């Protein structure tokens, strides 16, 4: 099965905050194997339209798939859903790679620039931008002061370290019942 950290990451990435509580039991049913949306609704005691909304969000994210079949007696379509655990891993790795890329860009920007700030907290400028403003805040006219951004650099490095060392490169999932 997928571990708790990966499941929480999936929910955070795909499901809205309002749907989070309802999504967990839907995901738990889905992870047990192929199941219809009606069966999920019965097992979770959630309204069918809520279950379907969550399932379609998972489908849009590529972590769930469905097969449509027609009931010969009623002529109604039945949707049998399946969880795609390998897609979860791919999605989360992609998202984490994007976060790492953006953090590296932010780190490079902070390390390669000198900053000046308005003493009243209005703006933060790079040296070039502050020069264009004659080291004067365009909002209040106060002089700008040099800003030591070493704390910001350290915070970015710490966050980057968390993402680079969190083990998402080695996510393990086992096959879900097919």
UniProtKB/Swiss-Prot annotation:
The keyword Transmembrane helix does not apply. SMART domains: TFIIE. Residues 3-89 form the HTH TFE/IIEalpha-type domain. One of its GO terms (biological process) is transcription initiation at RNA polymerase II promoter. Keywords: DNA-binding, Transcription, Transcription regulation. GO terms for molecular function: DNA binding. It holds the Pfam family TFIIE_alpha. The keyword Hydrolase does not apply. InterPro entries: TF_E_archaea, TFE, TFIIE/TFIIEa_HTH, TFIIE_asu, TFIIEa/SarR/Rpc3_HTH_dom, WH-like_DNA-bd_sf, WH_DNA-bd_sf. Belongs to the TFE family. Monomer. Interaction with RNA polymerase subunits RpoF and RpoE is necessary for Tfe stimulatory transcription activity. Able to interact with RNA polymerase in the absence of Tbp or DNA promoter. Interacts both with the preinitiation and elongation complexes. Transcription factor that plays a role in the activation of archaeal genes transcribed by RNA polymerase. Facilitates transcription initiation by enhancing TATA-box recognition by TATA-box-binding protein (Tbp), and transcription factor B (Tfb) and RNA polymerase recruitment. Not absolutely required for transcription in vitro, but particularly important in cases where Tbp or Tfb function is not optimal. It dynamically alters the nucleic acid-binding properties of RNA polymerases by stabilizing the initiation complex and destabilizing elongation complexes. The winged helix domain is involved in binding to DNA in the preinitiation complex. HAMAP family: TFE_arch. This is Transcription factor E. It comes from Methanothermobacter thermautotrophicus (strain ATCC 29096 / DSM 1053 / JCM 10044 / NBRC 100330 / Delta H).
């Amino acid at each position: 099965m997928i571990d708790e950290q990966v499941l929480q990451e999936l929910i955070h990435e795909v499901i809205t905050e309002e749907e989070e509580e309802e999504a967990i039991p839907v995901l738990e049913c889905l992870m047990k194997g192929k199941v219809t949306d009606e069966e999920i609704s019965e097992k979770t005691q959630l309204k069918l339209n809520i279950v379907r909304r969550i399932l379609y969000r998972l489908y849009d994210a590529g972590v769930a798939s469905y097969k449509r079949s027609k009931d010969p007696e009623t002529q109604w379509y039945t949707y049998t859903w399946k969880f795609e655990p390998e897609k979860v891993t791919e999605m989360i790795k992609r998202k984490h790679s994007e976060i790492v890329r953006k953090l590296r860009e932010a780190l490079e920007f902070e390390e390669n620039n000198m900053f000046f700030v308005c003493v009243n907290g209005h703006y933060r400028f790079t040296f070039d931008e502050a020069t264009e403003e004659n080291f004067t805040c365009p909002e209040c006219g106060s002089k700008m002061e040099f800003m030591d951004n070493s704390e910001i650099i350290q915070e970015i490095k710490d966050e980057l370290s968390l993402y680079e060392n969190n083990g998402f490169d080695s996510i393990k999932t086992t096959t879900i019942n097919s």
